[in-house]
Amino acid sequence: SLIQFETLIMKVAGQSGMFSYSA
């Protein structure tokens, strides 16, 4: 997967408090 996309998801998920994301 794309590093930039994963970083974006991680940032959004972290701010939303919904870190149900698999690399």
Swiss-Prot record:
Lineage: superkingdom: Eukaryota
E.C. number: 3.1.1.4
Record keywords: Calcium, Disulfide bond, Hemostasis impairing toxin, Hydrolase, Lipid degradation, Lipid metabolism, Metal-binding, Platelet aggregation inhibiting toxin, Secreted, Toxin
Function: Snake venom phospholipase A2 (PLA2) that shows a moderate inhibition of ADP-induced human platelet aggregation when tested on platelet rich plasma. Exhibits moderate hydrolytic activities and prefers the anionic micelles (dPPC with deoxycholate) to the zwitterionic micelles (dPPC with Triton X-100). PLA2 catalyzes the calcium-dependent hydrolysis of the 2-acyl groups in 3-sn-phosphoglycerides.
Keyword presence, Phosphoprotein: no
Protein name: Acidic phospholipase A2 CTs-A1
Protein location: Secreted
GO molecular function list: metal ion binding; phospholipase A2 activity; toxin activity
Location, primary (coarse class): secreted
GO annotation terms (biological process): lipid catabolic process
Family of the protein in this entry: Belongs to the phospholipase A2 family. Group II subfamily.
Mod. after translation: Contains 7 disulfide bonds.
Coiled coil: none
Reaction(s) the record says it catalyses: a 1,2-diacyl-sn-glycero-3-phosphocholine + H2O = a 1-acyl-sn-glycero-3-phosphocholine + a fatty acid + H(+)
Expression sites by tissue: Expressed by the venom gland.
Cofactor(s) needed: Ca(2+)
Cofactor note: Binds 1 Ca(2+) ion.
Gene Ontology terms: cellular component: extracellular region
